[in-house]
Amino acid sequence: MLPTLYTCLLWLSTSGLWTVQAKGSDTDMSTRNPHRDLAPNNVDFAFTLYKHLVASAPGKNVFISPVSISTALAMLSLGARGYTREQLLQGLGFNLTEMSEGEIHRAFRHLHHLLRESNTTLDMTMGNALFLDHSLELLESFSADTKHYYELEALTTDFQDWAGASRQINEYIKNKTQGNIVDLFSESDSSATLILVNYIFFKGMWAHSFDLESTREENFHVNEATTVQVPMMFQSNTIKYLNDSVLPCQLVQLDYTGNETVFFVLPVKGKMDSVITALSRDTIQRWSKSLTMSQVDLYIPKISISGAYDLGGIMGDMGIADLLSNRTHFSGITQEALPKVSKVVHKAALQVDEKGLEADAPTRVSLSAAPGPLTLRFNRPFIIMIFDDFTWSSLFLGKVVNPT
């Protein structure tokens, strides 16, 4: 039987996204905060993975949590040996001559601590669990290292009884995500002997809420042939806005309460691919510096999307070619030999609605001599990106083709 790796089982709910904005010197912050050493690699990995997934799913919604995938693969490397371990870490963008394996895992540990503990105004749960067949026994070194660096919870189950095992795993995920991910596993998977789960539950509140009474049904143009009705949210406020002179798009940056911020990016009609191709650390930094406070009448649809991806083929394209092959070497996980990983599955979901910390409608300021607010209506496919601006982490990336 082959071990199955299910990574990054997520639920993101309500209203806010996150930005990569440096505060002070990169060198000084990196020296004092090991999580900052991860930021460049994690962001580069995030956009590379995102572009691969978008290219593999033309005309479809895409939504992922890159930091969760990075976490799962880094954690898996603790059980890998030889070239398999080297390939995993290099595939995540790490140069082992510049950053040791110990430094990588210590930085992930620090990052997860900050993401969990620094956002006291948000409802966020992060964690890692490993379900293994009762016939297997974890190596003491793997158990100790994964618990120390990733707070991994190891649980045994009977994979010969898949119905019972799936109920156990589903109940665990349901409880950890406050009931928002249910019935995750349903189909029989008799090949599984080990399932690794990395989960995130996040529920945020907009720093400035949308006006609930102003939400109206409007057209959303999925493509030339398809138009759907969506509940379109509205707020009129002074917000960060940019009409990009380099890329064919407009964007706004909205904040959650806490450290999280969201980019909503609206490409010019027919130019989505051009904008996605250009997404990078440099692009985000340029946008962050170029955004200006502007009076905007903003229309964004309520969103309810989810994504499920088998990342095996994508990992191969990104330089982790041996992950699903017979050449893999995961002898550092259990006493018994595990021949290879059979699946790398990522699941995520997103809901965005009007709710914010402020119950009243945002204040609209207008002067008789000043020009009126500009109108920005997200009524065609757009990009959504969520960052944590304290850790510089790319938490969620999405392409919304159909918000329903």
Swiss-Prot record:
The keyword Transport applies. Glycosylation in position Asn-259 is needed for steroid binding. Cortisol binds at residues 253, 285, 392. It is found in: Secreted. The record marks 249 as: Conserved cysteine within steroid binding domain. Keywords: Glycoprotein, Lipid-binding, Secreted, Signal, Steroid-binding, Transport. One of its GO terms (biological process) is glucocorticoid metabolic process. One of its GO terms (cellular component) is extracellular space. GO terms for molecular function: serine-type endopeptidase inhibitor activity; steroid binding. Pfam families: Serpin. Glycans are attached at residues 95, 119, 175, 259, 326. InterPro entries: Serpin_CS, Serpin_dom, Serpin_fam, Serpin_sf, Serpin_sf_1, Serpin_sf_2. Residues 1-22 form the signal peptide. Belongs to the serpin family. Proteolytic cleavage leads to an important conformation change. This reduces the affinity for steroids. Major transport protein for glucocorticoids and progestins in the blood of almost all vertebrate species. This is Corticosteroid-binding globulin.
